[in-house]
Amino acid sequence: LPEEIAVPRAWSVTFYLLAVIFVLLFLYHQFILPKPKNDVPVKNGNPLNAFFQTFITFFQKKGIIAALAFILLFRFAESQLVKIASPFLLDNPEIGGLGLSTMQVGTIYGVVGLIALTIGGILGGILMAKNGLKHWIWWMTAAMNLPNLVYVYLAFTHPSNIWLISSAVAIEQFGYGFGFTALTYFMMLFSKGPL
């Protein structure tokens, strides 16, 4: 199939498969999964009041401004990179890109990148469980940001070797997965319990 047809078709097939999986999971949870006898809804009065009380309590926490700044800025560089990385990989070399096809970029991010991201996240979780956030925060911050330099390398060298480009994306995604663990763990710790 031509790439103009193959890409939309691949997305359609992906979402149809996801829809089937979700319907099967719904049916399993609705009809097959055992339900304990004491599984009854709990009523806490006015649900709207409880909803707003949760927000009020959260924003009264000590250090909320610093925590929100950390949450919003921790992956700031990565959020900027992710918007420009795909166009950089897709654009023609004449205008500064690497000239990859949509299928190549999809494979690099969807297979190589996802595997590296998952491994980085799992490793980050294991190390965080051993030594805690305080020990790993600077290492994970560096892991989140320093691998972005692979795109500087790619921009200067314009390699055509798909393995080199895939390795660079894998390094960046591994660092993102490893570093993102710190942000996730921080949000879990900060949001736990009242004040």
Enumerate the language-model features and the residues they cover:
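Conserved extracellular-gate-facing transmembrane-helix segments in secondary transporters
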Residues: 73-85, 176, 180
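Short amphipathic helix-loop junctions that connect adjacent transmembrane helices
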Residues: 74, 83-107
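Intracellular loop-helix junctions on the cytosolic face of multi-pass helical membrane proteins
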Residues: 1-80, 129
